A protein has these predicted regions:
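RNA-interacting cores
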Residues: 1-211
Length: 211
């Protein structure tokens, strides 16, 4: 697998237009690959006043066209193999993490007990609880108070094939420290992501080893 980073030039008109729609960004990401429609993860990250797009994929991407239209021409894009990171993951190892996700919940109907409509987790308490409940399933744990919500945003856009229907996604950013409890499950999480909206910039968890 490969992790790719490209700086977006927000001074360019084309880039500002791109950022108005998650569907447009999804199209740009898909255009960087020649293969079939594999699952790819991506997200936007702000760092030091600059905006980057991260892309995690099985196939090595070609973002040259994207750089010409939306990127920083001097920086281009950087692709690194993901396997060296995966081989460093061991049981009980600790990592700083950042996750951008779409936390949701399904409330059962009192009258029937059937699963109800899926809704975004509205408050920070619900959003933190969503991640806490899923940690074990994905092979990690977090100490109480060991993570926090650092960002909340809404994205409303139209899918290219469904222009008559809008899509609303709540984006929640988490940061903290985790401990790996199941190496294989955790590696799968890193490669496949978590939650809904993964085609539209959600679900990618990145880690950095604690000193």
């Amino acid at each position: 697998m490969y992790l790719t980073r490209m700086e977006l030039d927000t001074d360019r008109r084309s880039t500002r237009k791109l950022l108005t729609s998650r569907s447009r960004i999804h199209g740009m990401v898909e255009g960087a690959f020649s293969g079939g429609r594999e699952r790819r993860l991506w997200r936007l990250d702000s760092l030091g006043g600059r905006l980057y797009i991260l892309v995690l994929s099985e196939e090595k991407p070609n973002l040259e066209a994207a750089v010409r239209e939306y990127g920083n021409l001097e920086e281009g894009f950087l692709t690194r193999e993901y396997e060296p990171l995966l081989t460093r993951i061991t049981d009980q190892s600790q990592w700083r993490f950042r996750l951008v996700a779409n936390p949701t919940q399904s409330i059962s109907r009192a009258s029937t007990g059937k699963r109800g409509k899926v809704r975004a987790c509205a408050g920070v308490v619900q959003q933190e609880d969503w991640l806490r409940k899923r940690a074990g399933k994905h092979g990690f744990m977090m100490e109480e108070g060991g993570f926090r919500v650092v960002g909340n945003d809404w994205h409303i856009f139209h899918k290219r094939e469904e222009k008559d229907r809008s899509v609303s996604l709540r984006e929640v950013s988490y940061e903290g420290v985790l401990t790996v409890t199941d190496v294989e499950k955790f590696k799968e999480l890193l490669c496949r992501g978590m939650g809904r909206g993964r085609a539209y910039g959600m679900g990618l968890l990145t880690i950095m080893r604690l000193p």
